[in-house]
Amino acid sequence: RACIRKYWALPRRDSIMHETGLRILIRKIQLVAAQYDKALTPVFSYSKEHYMRVFLRNDKGKNKADEILKLHGMLNGAGPMWLGKLWDINIIDKICKNSLKSRIFSKNNELMKFLKTIKEESKINAVGFYDLNGICEKNKIKKLQKKETIKNKIRKLGYKASDTHFKSEGVSSDIPLNKLIKLLKNK
């Protein structure tokens, strides 16, 4: 009820709820900005533990604001939400390069792994990700292959694949679900 009241959107408690929540938050911010003819585009977004952070670029103009609103929609019964990109690849590259140069940040292995994951994830043009354990359970696939093996098989089929920062068992990919299930069933 709080999500409907505060963000004018319907949430879902499922494996991608953190990404869904982030996208609902972005949409709400964009709606408020659009009232003032401002178009806000995410350049860096993440959900970690119980926190969500969104950094946005502000472009002025009613036409630009209208274009942003066209990228709102539903996903798996949740939303409406932002269905555009969560990251600007150029900004992610700069953040990663600057972090590597920094004596403080470069020694923080957890931070560097987190940034690397987001950098890879930002290259995939997909909304949502695949929860491998959930897919295997739902489709009665008894043995799950290693995640790295699955990602390599997806890439061999010509699709993109990376880890997702939203969930450790998740894979972000542009592969259709039916092809992923077939891949998981074939060992």
Feature names for model-found ranges:
Residues 1-187:
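SAM-dependent transferase fold signal centered on methyltransferase-like domains
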